[in-house]
C-alpha cells in the first residue's frame, strides 16, 4: 500500500529495503502489479533472512541478522553473569547480506 501511495504521488524509486522479509514480499507484489522487472527495474532487500525468502520467485535477497548466534551469545553471557563470571560489557554482531534473485 505504501509503495502504491508513493507511486501515486509521482515518486520514483529503484530499490526497496524492507524492515522485514514479509514486508519485502509486499514490495514483490507491488512490482508485479506495476509490471516491473525484478531486479532490473526494482531491487528488493528484506530483513531477517526468514523462511519466506525461498517462498517467492525470484528468491528474496535478505539481511541475515544472525539471530541464532545472538541468542546463543545471550544465553552464554547470562549464565556467566549468574555464575559470577566477568563478562564483556559490549559485544558487536554484524549482519550479512544474503544475495538472491531480487538484487543484481
Model-derived regions: residue spans:
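Helix-loop module immediately N-terminal to the HCX5R catalytic loop
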Residues: 1
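Flexible loop/turn connectors
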Residues: 4-104
Amino acid at each position: 500500500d505504501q509503495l502504491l501511495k508513493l507511486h501515486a504521488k509521482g515518486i520514483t524509486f529503484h530499490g526497496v529495503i524492507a524492515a522485514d522479509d514479509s514486508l519485502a514480499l509486499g514490495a514483490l507484489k507491488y512490482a508485479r502489479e506495476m509490471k516491473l522487472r525484478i531486479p532490473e527495474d526494482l531491487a528488493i532487500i528484506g530483513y531477517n533472512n526468514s523462511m519466506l525468502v525461498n517462498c517467492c520467485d525470484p528468491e528474496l535477497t535478505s539481511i541475515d541478522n544472525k539471530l541464532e548466534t545472538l541468542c546463543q551469545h545471550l544465553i552464554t553471557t547470562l549464565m556467566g553473569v549468574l555464575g559470577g563470571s566477568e563478562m564483556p560489557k559490549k559485544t558487536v554482531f554484524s549482519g550479512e547480506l544474503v544475495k538472491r534473485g531480487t538484487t543484481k
